């Protein structure tokens, strides 16, 4: 890294700032949701859509980001991503209704979807291959700091200013990043194949309408007939994509990917697994504030041990997987995460608040081990010519499953509770207890998928550096 030219190091800093903005925004909102609900005159049970609108937009737009960067140029697309993200942040802060906020979050999601993958592509183009891993470690480090600062910073801003400031802080950073991108980043382009627009639209429609239908009549205000229509449209769109992709070498995601058994199992497990674990970052600060009466800042601080546990476990997860094999690790961490979820609920309802940081630290460790294992299992056996496509599909599924998880968590709260819940009441705690029990059950279900993974430790080693560089 030290022998890189000055202009290359500046370009890496620009990418790192983009990673930081995107990762900070995924966590800073969570602790502000109850305050947003009060300010906008909405029930806290509806606020999960603030997260879903962002994450679902990222999932929908991800497949197009790499192609756009190759076609239009990495500088142009990265600049556009920062501008859209910054404008979305401004519109979020100016929103006076929930619907306005959801539209602004979707605009943020378009920028966020392009920022991270185009940033990775930029690093691949400006850094020699032998220094790629060191450069990626450098630019992704701020992305790890973002989730650490996000909850506490969000709580601090909400408690001592207002929720609008969790979006306003993005504006000066975004302006500086946009100017620096235009001045310092080269506009690399590559010859591209024809973009599969038909496949992209079919997948986008299928994902969006099915997630919207899952929110139910209470969340969307739609009639049962309209929701049934959405489900039908979504299913038809996905079936049409499968027919479109069959024997189509130019399909957005080739069906040849699923001939690799570990990819199929890993992708199915990642989808189901992240539905369950995607509920936790949303539900935990909401439960701490509405169910237990914590202040926004205190609730944000309570999330830090979970992030620390996750970061600490990444250092040894490869050794753990190589020692015990993917099947044992994934089944154990899936069931373990379910048990830790129950332990958190029990500890909180008993009033043992001093134990909660240790439980959340353990939750972060278990979750991190499972995430890393799921990712490497999914990609490790793919042939080199399918590695990039498989990585893109996995990234899309990760975002989609998290949006579905948050949607289901909001649906569970709506099923067990009324439209308005009061802070720190017995009824509210009962609602959260039933919701948490349901979440623990959902989190445990992917163990049935992971139990089918071959348990040959020598074959199921962590993904090689050669394949990582090919993605």
UniProtKB/Swiss-Prot annotation:
GO cellular component, one term: plasma membrane
Gene3D superfamilies cross-referenced by the UniProt entry: MFS general substrate transporter like domains, Multidrug resistance protein D
Sorted UniProt keywords: Cell inner membrane, Cell membrane, Membrane, Transmembrane, Transmembrane helix, Transport
Primary localization: membrane
Membrane topology (UniProt): Multi-pass membrane protein
Any GO molecular function: transmembrane transporter activity
Lineage: superkingdom: Bacteria
Keyword Magnesium assigned: no
Ranges of the Cytoplasmic topological domain: 33-48, 98-101, 159-164, 218-224, 284-285, 363-395, 452-471
Subcellular location: Cell inner membrane
Alphabetical list of SUPFAM superfamilies matching this protein: MFS general substrate transporter
Keyword Cell inner membrane: yes
Positions on the Periplasmic side per record topology: 1-11, 70-76, 125-137, 186-196, 246-262, 307-341, 417-430
A Pfam family hit: MFS_1
Disulfide pattern: none
Transmembrane segments annotated in the record for this chain: 12-32, 49-69, 77-97, 102-124, 138-158, 165-185, 197-217, 225-245, 263-283, 286-306, 342-362, 396-416, 431-451
Family as reported in the entry's similarity comment: Belongs to the major facilitator superfamily. TCR/Tet family.
Record's protein name: Putative multidrug resistance protein MdtD
Organism of provenance: Escherichia coli O17:K52:H18 (strain UMN026 / ExPEC)
Lineage: Bacteria, Pseudomonadati, Pseudomonadota, Gammaproteobacteria, Enterobacterales
